[in-house]
Regions:
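Extracellular/periplasmic carbohydrate-active domains that bind, remodel
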Residues: 1-214
């Protein structure tokens, strides 16, 4: 597992011209630190995805501590921009840290995601899975959010995010759980009949288009 526990990364390279029509199966973009590795200062720009279930999956977990530092990993300072995704499933974009290992400083800008939809509202909380294998199904195949689920994370900017459901969906477009400093601007939602586009639990300092959410 050297790549998931390493604290030394070279993100200076720029990867272009990734082949189109590349079907990933689970998550189109997966950022995972579960063995103590540090992932920071990465930009994802100008990406179009099809044939995926979850557009973006960001997971910070405690499967193992780093063998050198004895610490859990870090995920911070990531930018996602100019992204479109046509998903074939119902599991939304996930940003999930842990109660003691929080994901910080993430920007989602100019993103359009399309999901199958057709789900009922979900009232139960997602289970923690602190040592599970990192993949979009690790918290279950159901999710309380139709387009974006954020848990154990701080300082997230969501700007010009458009969520579409092909079938009428009862879930809110965004669900926030134990999150702070979440700033949402220009959110668009199509196909959701939830009473609120955004639901939250145990959160603080949430703003939507500059207005504080209580």
């Amino acid at each position: 597992r050297p790549t998931t526990e390493s604290n030394i990364w070279d993100w200076s390279k720029e990867y272009r011209h990734i082949a189109p029509k590349t079907h990933t199966g689970l998550s189109g973009i997966a950022i995972e630190s579960v063995d103590g590795g540090i992932i920071e200062q990465v930009t994802f720009n100008n990406i179009s995805m099809e044939g995926i279930i979850t557009p973006i999956f960001i997971c910070l977990n405690h499967r193992r501590m780093n063998q050198h530092s004895g610490q859990s990993g870090i995920i911070r300072n990531l930018l996602f921009s100019n992204i479109t995704a046509k998903a074939e499933g119902i599991i939304p974009t996930l940003i999930a840290g842990t109660p003691t290992g929080r994901i910080t400083d993430i920007t989602l800008r100019d993103i359009t995601v399309e999901h199958a939809g057709g789900e009922k509202a979900m009232t139960k909380s997602l289970p923690e899975n602190l040592k599970g294998y990192p993949e979009n199904r690790m918290y279950g195949k159901e999710n309380p959010a139709g387009g974006l689920y954020i848990r154990h994370a701080d300082n997230i900017l969501i700007e010009n995010f458009h969520i579409r459901q092909r079938n009428t969906d009862e879930r809110p477009s965004i669900f926030l759980d134990d999150a702070t400093d979440i700033h949402i601007e220009k959110l668009q939602s199509t196909g959701s009949i939830a009473k609120k586009m955004i639901e939250h639990s145990k959160c603080s300092n949430i703003t939507i288009d500059g207005r504080v959410v209580k």
